[in-house]
Amino acid sequence: MVIDYNAIIVMEDLNKGFKRGRFKVERQVYQKFENMLISKLNYLVFKERKADENGGILRGYQLTYIPKSIKNVGKQCGCIFYVPAAYTSKIDPSTGFINIFDFKKYSGSGINAKVKDKKEFLMSMNSIRYINEGSEEYEKIGHRELFAFSFDYDNFKTYNVSSPVNEWTAYTYGERIKKLYKDGRWLRSEVLNLTENLIKLMEQYNIEYKDGHDIREDISHMDETRNADFICSLFEELKYTVQLRNSKSEAEDENYDRLVSPILNSSNGFYDSSDYMENENNTTHTMPKDADANGAYCIALKGLYEINKIKQNWSDDKKFKENELYINVTEWLDYIQNRRFE
C-alpha cells in the first residue's frame, strides 16, 4: 500500500514508560515487530519484479533508515510516523467529544456518598431537561424522547485537558454497560437503559418532567439528607450517559466492545459503533465498528494532521524541525472537534 498509494504508516508513539511498564513478553513482542518493520522497509524488494526494475533486488525502495537505537527513533523514521495515543479510543469520531469530568472527586464508600458535592455538580449543569414529543429538539434528535444534560466544561473540575469546544449537550441515547465488582474484582456486567431508569426515578419522586422544564429547579429545593437517593441516582445516570466505551468481560461476550456517543452530530444522529459492525461489508460506511477500530481511525487522523503540518511548514531553505511534528491534546481536539480534515 505504501508504494501503490504513496502512503505513510502511522503508529502509536509508545513511550519508554510503556516499554518498561508492560509485561516482559508483551514489550519484547512490540519491540521485535517495530524493529522488523523498520528493517523490512529499509530496503523493500518485490520478488516478482525483475532485478533492475524499481522494487527489484538491485533497485529496492529505501523507505526507512536504521536508527542507532530504537529508543532514539523520534517522531519519524522515513515513511513511519509516530503519534501520541492520547484520546484516540475513548472519543466520539463524529463530534470529537471526550469525557473529561473528574468523577473521582465524587466517589465514596457507598452510592450516597458525598451528596452535597453531587448536588453542586448537578446544579452546575446549564440545564437538565426531558425532550418530549412536539418540541423542536424532539424533531432534531430523530423523534426520540430522551433526557438532555447541557453543560460547559469550564464550570467543572476536569482532567488537565484544554478542550476547544466546552459547551455540550449529552442525551440519554442508547445503552451503557455498568461493571459490577466484588472484592475489587470485576464480577459481571449490567446493561443500563438510561432513559427508562431516569423516567422511573422522576416518577418515584413525583417530578413532572414531561413538560420539559429544567429539573435543576426541583433539585435546588431538595434536602440533601431526605433526597440523597434521588440526587445520587441522577448523578450516576449522568456519569454513565457520558461513558463512551462499553465493554463486557471475555466470559460474558468477548466481542462486545461498543462505543456509544451521547452527543448529536452534524448528521442529526448519534455515533454508535454497533451500527457499523452490522454493515462492516458495506464500503459506503467509513466509521469505526468498535473501540479498537476507533483507536486506529484516530491514530490515522493524527497522521494526516502531521502530513498537513509538514506541507504547511516545509521550506527547501531550512531544515524541518522535529518538534513541528509534535501534536498536543488541544491541537488534536481542535482538529477533530472542528473537523479540520474535511
PLM region spans:
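Positively charged, helix-rich recognition surfaces that bind polyanionic ligands
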Residues: 1-342
